Curated annotation (Swiss-Prot):
<comment type="subunit">
    <text>Interacts with ILK.</text>
</comment>
<dbReference type="GO" id="GO:0051015">
    <property type="term" value="F:actin filament binding"/>
</dbReference>
<feature type="domain" description="LIM zinc-binding">
    <location>
        <begin position="39"/>
        <end position="99"/>
    </location>
</feature>
<dbReference type="GO" id="GO:0005737">
    <property type="term" value="C:cytoplasm"/>
</dbReference>
<feature type="binding site">
    <location>
        <position position="89"/>
    </location>
    <ligand>
        <name>Zn(2+) 2</name>
    </ligand>
</feature>
<comment type="function">
    <text>Acts as an activator of the protein-kinase ILK, thereby regulating cell motility.</text>
</comment>
<dbReference type="InterPro" id="IPR001781">
    <property type="entry name" value="Znf_LIM"/>
</dbReference>
<dbReference type="GO" id="GO:0005886">
    <property type="term" value="C:plasma membrane"/>
</dbReference>
<feature type="binding site">
    <location>
        <position position="44"/>
    </location>
    <ligand>
        <name>Zn(2+) 1</name>
    </ligand>
</feature>
<dbReference type="GO" id="GO:0005634">
    <property type="term" value="C:nucleus"/>
</dbReference>
<keyword id="KW-0862">Zinc</keyword>
<dbReference type="InterPro" id="IPR044115">
    <property type="entry name" value="LIM_LIMD2"/>
</dbReference>
<dbReference type="GO" id="GO:0015629">
    <property type="term" value="C:actin cytoskeleton"/>
</dbReference>
<dbReference type="GO" id="GO:0046872">
    <property type="term" value="F:metal ion binding"/>
</dbReference>
<keyword id="KW-0963">Cytoplasm</keyword>
<keyword id="KW-0479">Metal-binding</keyword>
<keyword id="KW-0539">Nucleus</keyword>
Length: 128
């Protein structure tokens, strides 16, 4: 009985007969045919194929599209810095933002502490 069951599992056919010869076991092959999702590059919006796929900060890029926003040098996963969804080489990131001492100001945005100061002023005028 174990030999017949093992033989039934080893045969690629869809039907296998048991040891008595009159019982039939139905077998079906199940294939996982998942539709492949087309991934698009965050930089150029074109299809990214698995061989050229690179993921940085949960965004998908072509290897050739993953470059510094300032100098357009090709980046690697170990040689980039990201801020607000923009990618930079480490030298330009330091040059552009470290000199200011405040990353938000370097990006031309309001300082985070200024946003809180406006809320305190607004709440102070309402209670007074």
């Amino acid at each position: 009985m174990f030999q017949a069951a093992g033989a039934a599992q080893a045969t690629p056919s869809h039907e296998a007969k048991g040891s008595s010869g009159n019982s039939t076991v139905q077998r079906s092959k199940s294939f996982s045919l998942r539709a492949q999702v087309k991934e698009t590059c965050a930089a150029c919006q074109k299809t990214v194929y698995p061989m050229e796929r690179l993921v940085a900060d949960k965004l998908i890029f072509h290897n050739s599209c993953f470059c510094c926003k300032h100098c357009h040098t090709k980046l690697s996963l170990g040689s980039y810095a990201a801020m607000h969804g923009e990618f930079y080489c480490k030298p330009h990131f330091q040059q552009l933002f470290k000199s200011k001492g405040n990353y938000d100001e370097g990006f031309g945005r309001k300082q985070h502490k200024e946003l809180w100061a406006h809320k305190e002023v607004d709440s102070g005028t309402k209670t007074a």
